From Swiss-Prot:
InterPro entries: PRC_barrel-like_sf (IPR011033), PRC_RimM (IPR056792), RimM (IPR011961), RimM_N (IPR002676), RimM_N_sf (IPR036976), Transl_B-barrel_sf (IPR009000). This is Ribosome maturation factor RimM. Its main location: cytoplasm. The gene is rimM. Binds ribosomal protein uS19. PANTHER family: RIBOSOME MATURATION FACTOR RIMM. Residues 114-191 form the PRC barrel domain. Keywords: Chaperone, Cytoplasm, Ribosome biogenesis, rRNA processing. The keyword Cytoplasm applies. Belongs to the RimM family. The PRC barrel domain binds ribosomal protein uS19. One of its GO terms (molecular function) is ribosome binding. It comes from Paracidovorax citrulli (strain AAC00-1). One of its GO terms (cellular component) is cytoplasm.
Length: 191
């Protein structure tokens, strides 16, 4: 297998977003199976340049630092994605990538449909209610069955951090302003 280019960590794009990980080799011709972190893997398909980093959990890998992986093709297969990359030509090479974390530039994501948002764009947004009362900032989002839930962090007395959960549905969310870094909701602080 030809050596994959090793990039300096500074070469990871500033807008890089972790979108999945390589699960295992798939077949004998260098294909590998990817577990995307999203139900919609379009971000993986839209970028032909994936940046890999070794797993934080210590998966064995032949590389350290950041590796640029030029993608020949990627497609959905069952509940995952399979991909083929330049320089990964056999099963052994694909197995060497097992556990690697996949990053793509946020700028390569396809445009979201109206009233749809990438979770990564919502993290850190300030959430206020209709009266302008600050409820916290989005720390994470949870897929809770039929809906997504915003998990907010807010300061409490004594320096502790509080947590608030708000369903991310139109019944409670009035407006999302990505550019203004704000979400307006129909919610009260004491809910």
């Amino acid at each position: 297998m030809p050596a994959l280019p090793i990039l300096d960590p500074a070469d990871l794009p500033a807008d890089a977003v972790e979108v999945g990980r390589i699960a295992d080799a798939w077949g004998v011709k260098g294909w590998f199976k990817v577990l995307p972190y999203s139900a919609d893997p379009e971000a993986l398909f839209s970028s032909k340049r994936w940046y890999l980093q070794p797993s934080e959990k210590g998966a064995k890998s032949f590389f350290t630092g950041t590796v640029l992986l030029p993608i020949r093709q990627a497609r959905e297969h069952s509940d995952s994605v399979v991909a083929q990359a330049q320089g990964v030509d056999d099963r052994d090479a694909a197995e060497a990538l097992r556990g690697a974390r996949i990053f793509v530039p946020r700028s390569s994501f396809p445009t979201a449909a109206e009233d749809e948002y990438y979770w990564v764009d919502l993290i850190g947004l300030e959430v206020v209610n209709r009266e302008g009362v600050a409820l916290g900032s989005v720390r994470e989002l949870l897929a809770t069955g039929p809906q997504t839930t915003l998990v907010l962090s807010f300061p409490q007395e004594g320096g502790k951090e509080g947590e608030r959960m708000i369903p991310f549905v139109s019944a409670f969310v009035d407006r999302v302003d990505i550019a203004g870094r704000r979400i307006v909701v129909d919610w009260q602080p004491d809910y």
